[in-house]
Amino acid sequence: MFRTPHTLQFCSVHYKTFIDAIHALQSRISQKVLCRSCSSRVSGPAKKYDVDPSQFPQENIRNFCIVAHVDHGKSTLSDRLLEFTDTIRTSKDNQQVLDRLPVERERGITVKAQTVSMVYHRPGHESPFLLNLIDTPGHVDFSYEVLRSVAVCQGVILLVDANQGVQAQTVANFNMAFCSDLTILPVLNKVDLKNADVEGVTSQMENLFGTRREDVLKVSAKLGTGVEELIEAIIDRIPSPKGDADAKFRGFLLDSWYDRYRGVIALLMAVDGTLRLGDEIISHMTGTSYTVRDLGFLNPLETPTAMLCAGQAGYVVANMRSPKEAHVGDTLSHKSADIKPLPKLEESKPMVFAGIYPEDQSQNNELRSAIDRLLLNDPSVQVSIESNPALGQGWRLGFLGLLHMDVFCQRLDQEFDAQVVVTAPSVSYKVKVHGAKNIKKYGGEMVTVNNPLHLPDRSIIREYYEPMAFGTIITPGTYLRDVTSLCVDRRGVPKSTQDVDDNTILLQYKFPLNEIIVDFYDELKSITSGYASFDYEETGYEESSLVQMQILINGKVVEELTTIVHTTRAQRVGRSMLLKLKECIPQQLYAVALQAAVGAKVLAREDIRALKKNVLAKCYGGDITRKVKLLKRHSEKQKKLRLIGNVEVPRDAFIKVLKRT
């Protein structure tokens, strides 16, 4: 490049100016450092943290969660509690502050239990209170999240919609809290609505839960009325944690999530002792040691602190690099031989199983990584590898319910951009085999079958067992006949009936789990105009009459479409599958027979007609025997093609038949 003397002079001047600026900046920095060091010698170290956990003795700590039926206002009440305690600024934009997942905001439901620490300065008290709130999901499919929350709390807010009244999940949440021996605060929400029946719903709670009428608090989470009285009741009625503050640290791993830069971030409830930066902790489940790199409160964002004391909940960043190192329910403590682990959580039992496959097999490794990351945040899902000739390699996943499965797959899509194919959901069955050789082969007399393809040969099966569920239905009395008819049609056995009030009835049935996991709730809502509610819990296995149904195409078994059904449902399910398959398989040069069979017995059949060919097109008249000869020859060719021809079933056909509707 050509440069004039003027240009060189201009560049040298600006270069000198730049160097002078750098020296000036270095001088300022050194002066600031010097001033800071001098001031620290005089007045001590500068304040590093916004919150000092040591100012909260255990008697000033309350750990509680909010439990309620779906859409009764848990998240809205959490927003008002955060605003009243000045944890967040009051704003009209504060909606579902603790619902951080995209799927939660899109569906308007809580999927993950979220923890937040609130500092409350009670009038007339010098020392502040620390209120640890856990906002829990309301749907039955996420009951494991509620169970984890209940395990570390001393009290619960039982929230009931004053407009809708007590619902089925409300009963389940009450039973869970009651069995855990927690203090229960009954609270009526949405009392500001015109149709709110405060007295009527209070009577419902009195009849079902035995609560005293004067103990029921009345709030409006939308307007914020009654929130101050609720906070005062939390402090007065819910007991403080009873850990040993002077003992060595011991904490309960409540939840965890993954950060690509810091690794695994654990959510801990400190039970005993104090945890500080730099402490060495050990996992009682894996025996691995870690060094604490960062810790603090969730307020609701991460707020670093110098320590976590007994009774407090907070996040901990140690050198956990693999998502598989964090186990929910694990005990993390200081290294010591005399520290006993805390009681473990009861493991969740998957109720619904489905196959998950990548839409493109080249994305198999990426999907495996995405599933591992989600399992860190959702340990209730069980995973095993499976292979399908039609769909390729995939995974068999166990979920707590259909909504749980829906949300899991949606999170795969939204958070990891993983497109998946989900097969039709099924439940886990059990069979009893006989014969010493067979018992040795399967490792016991009882064999659990999560995949219909893995069902042992029926000649060695002595008994079949299917999972059962205890269902609770709360419905207006005007729909009683329709609801009863639906329950009987789903093979339900009535157990009890109770009047909630003059217009509402509580029904309890025992159902086969397979009859209620897919579309029972939708049908119940449909026949009751949306007024009924439903909740269920697994009650174990019972002997049943089950069969393995196979789909045949031109006499050849298609293993991928094998399923297990009850004998009374076999024909209906078989017919439905054949109709879907018929729509998906293109016409061939020969007729194709689709059959649903149990053993040698055919239960249903559908035919795909052959493509028509006008073999008489070249005959314009003449002897009739010529036409007969051509028709006969064409018929023989079709028979031969049918015997030796392979019907190629498109991959899309398997997806449409196996995919849930």
Swiss-Prot record:
Any GO MF annotation of the entry: mitochondrial ribosome binding
Catalyzed reaction equations: GTP + H2O = GDP + phosphate + H(+)
GO biological process: positive regulation of translation; translation
Cell compartments where the protein resides: Mitochondrion inner membrane
EC class name: hydrolase
Function, in words: Promotes mitochondrial protein synthesis. May act as a fidelity factor of the translation reaction, by catalyzing a one-codon backward translocation of tRNAs on improperly translocated ribosomes. Binds to mitochondrial ribosomes in a GTP-dependent manner.
Residue span, tr-type G domain: 59-242
Entry protein name: Translation factor GUF1 homolog, mitochondrial
Annotated source species: Ixodes scapularis (Black-legged tick)
